Amino acid sequence: MTTLPEITVQELQQRLAAGAALVDVREVDEYEQGHVPGARLIPLGELPGRVAEVPAGEQVLMICRSGARSAKAGEFLIGEGRDVVNVAGGTLAWIEAGFEVNTGNQP
């Protein structure tokens, strides 16, 4: 089993500013209630059928509510040949750090 690398929400903010891709694997209702600006929604249960939507050839950042589902998603995607990093603490840590969140269904 591969150890999934992790970054902090502070590192996430820096990487997003540099144009990194972020995938949120929570459910639609969770995403709509509040998500990191720019995060693309691909619910964990849909991920196996939507792997092609995850950018290849670049590192992709994964996020969920607390970091558990995104870690599972990351391990799966590593097996699919993707380069992924998990966001430690997830959206809860992002909000706790005082960063902006978007609501609704648009990234």
Where are the model-predicted features located?
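Short, surface-exposed ligand- or partner-binding patches at beta-edge/loop junctions that are enriched
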Residues: 63
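Rhodanese-like catalytic fold shared by cysteine-dependent sulfurtransferases
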Residues: 1-21, 27-59, 68-107
